[in-house]
Amino acid sequence: MSVSVCPCGSGNLLDACCGHYHAGTPAPDAQALMRSRYSAYVLGLVDYLVATTLPAQQADLDRAAMAAWSAQSTWLGLEVESAEVLGGQPEHGFVTFTARWHDQDGDHQHRERSAFVQHAGRWYFIDPTVGLKAGRNDPCPCASGQKFKKCCASYVGS
């Protein structure tokens, strides 16, 4: 049992917060998944970061770059500005946040409005840096069974 405070900024212990998501419990919503992904970067849990990215994008992730960024950064904090659940089937959500870190080039902060989709009881991050190989009338890569244009297309800027 970990007695360390969770890096996500909740103030809770890691095991009572993001730690159980890292151990396999599905995050209950997009904000919890986003917080657990930040904690995974802090803790160097690249397998978790890959597993919580939309499955159709996982093969194209640069695991080595993710691991290097995680290891070479001192993580300074996470601020969640807003979380929106849009409903529908499948359920989509957005989380707006700012992450701060320090590396050999100095202090940095990154503000992002991340998109998420829920499928089969699990939330997934839709990575804007990894293209989705789907035409508008193709089945959606999130495996919802809907056409891409009726599902995730508007959430990935395609």
Curated annotation (Swiss-Prot):
Tree of life domain: Bacteria
Family matches, as Pfam families: SEC-C, YchJ_M-like
Residues passing through the membrane, by range: none
InterPro entries: NTF2-like_dom_sf, SEC_C_motif, UPF0225, YchJ-like_M
Family: Belongs to the UPF0225 family.
Protein name: UPF0225 protein PputGB1_4297
Source organism: Pseudomonas putida (strain GB-1)
Native organism taxonomy: Bacteria, Pseudomonadati, Pseudomonadota, Gammaproteobacteria, Pseudomonadales
